[in-house]
């Protein structure tokens, strides 16, 4: 049985207030279904106009896997920050670790990536998440990421 939903949708305006990232390095468009078990789904609509496609690769554009991992980390950051109770919400997220990273299939312009993230551990201000990046329900990348939430 799935954990109850705490927050239905975090839109881009709230993401901009939550994360310090900006164009061209803000790599999620919204986060949906943040649940009480500290899980949620980040959404990234991949456009041919992404700056990464200028060099990756001009004749056959493929969305870089490392940017998918960053998208996972940004999704995890939003889930962590939005899940902290009270008025003293963290104001910064620092990416700490990447483990068990695998790239399964290429992501192309026009694809929508869903970053399915779930907390697998927490100690004080440090959080760890497992993530699957999916396109049309197919896993295209996976990783465990760690982050520190701080002022």
UniProtKB/Swiss-Prot annotation:
GO terms for molecular function: (3R)-hydroxyacyl-[acyl-carrier-protein] dehydratase activity. It catalyses: a (3R)-hydroxyacyl-[ACP] = a (2E)-enoyl-[ACP] + H2O. Its EC number is 4.2.1.59. Coiled coil: none annotated. Its main location: cytoplasm. GO terms for biological process: fatty acid biosynthetic process; lipid A biosynthetic process. The active site is at residue 56. It is an enzyme of class 4 (lyase). The keyword Cytoplasm applies. Keywords: Cytoplasm, Lipid A biosynthesis, Lipid biosynthesis, Lipid metabolism, Lyase. One of its GO terms (cellular component) is membrane. The keyword Transmembrane helix does not apply. It is found in: Cytoplasm. Belongs to the thioester dehydratase family. FabZ subfamily. Involved in unsaturated fatty acids biosynthesis. Catalyzes the dehydration of short chain beta-hydroxyacyl-ACPs and long chain saturated and unsaturated beta-hydroxyacyl-ACPs. HAMAP family: FabZ (MF_00406). This is 3-hydroxyacyl-[acyl-carrier-protein] dehydratase FabZ. The gene is fabZ.
